[in-house]
Amino acid sequence: MSFVKMTGSGNDFVFFDGRTTPIDLVTQPEAIKAICNRYNGIGADGLVVLEPLQEEADVRVHYYNSDGTAADLCGNATLCSTAISAQWGITSASGMRLATGAGLINSRIDGLPAIALQPITDIRPDMPIAPATAQGRRVGFAVAGIPHLVILCEDADAVDVAGAGPALRRHEATGPAGANVNWVSPRPDGSWRYRTFERGVEGETLACGTGAVATAVLLRSWGLSDGATTTIRTSSGRDVEVDLEPLTAPDGRSLEGFRPTLRGEGRVVFRGEIAGL
């Protein structure tokens, strides 16, 4: 079976073309774990199958975490899906509609892939979690397709992500499914540095697209970012950009929430064949 290995700012994925790969074959939990294994498999944070559609969208994005569980959305995987869908000729680079578990996403390639996520309205600037316990100064929550804790701290690079992440990822305040956990701190140039502990990977990843979106939303809610675009440095050293458009009613009234657009890398690393599962 043919595959493509892709990366979005260090968040890496194994992609399959649903036109030539039986979806059921590669999306069994044990198959996903084997393919994503970094020692005996290809190695990745997640697995994606792209299935061309005819009506409600151009492509359905089937996304799975490396532990074999399905997820409604992965921002960096969606950026990569945008790039490879155009390369495979499934869609046009100038605009495409991607069906995800978190709703329809419009995307395009304009230098870098850019995806317009569904509006974010579940925003909680203060969570009932002691900031000191979370190694930060303030703890907020937002659902950017999937749930995220965002923790404002002095220096994200000094945080013990591996030590603090597991308990926070399952904190009762985030609900039964838990949440990804993001730590964010300011950089001298006005951008931000963040690190993420991801559920489903159960460890730190080099980048998290929806985490960057949730982080930008909380920074705006906390009054720490007032520009249209928030630039966030990932652990791979690459930047992602998040644009936030305040929601408005048809009559012009302001509504609670934002309409986000995420821009970032979606790059093919290598192509190959799987000998067997």
Swiss-Prot record:
Residues carrying the site annotation Could be important to modulate the pK values of the two catalytic cysteine residues: 148, 198
Where in or outside the cell is it found? Cytoplasm
Q: Does the keyword NAD apply?
A: no
Describe which pathway this protein belongs to, using the record's wording: Amino-acid biosynthesis; L-lysine biosynthesis via DAP pathway; DL-2,6-diaminopimelate from LL-2,6-diaminopimelate: step 1/1
Q: What class of enzyme is it?
A: isomerase
One GO term in the molecular function aspect is: diaminopimelate epimerase activity
Q: Does the keyword Transport apply?
A: no
InterPro entries under this entry? Answer: DAP_epimerase_DapF
Q: How does this chain assemble? A: Homodimer.
Q: What is the stated purpose of this protein?
A: Catalyzes the stereoinversion of LL-2,6-diaminopimelate (L,L-DAP) to meso-diaminopimelate (meso-DAP), a precursor of L-lysine and an essential component of the bacterial peptidoglycan.
Under which name does UniProt file this protein? Diaminopimelate epimerase
- The gene from which this protein is expressed is dapF
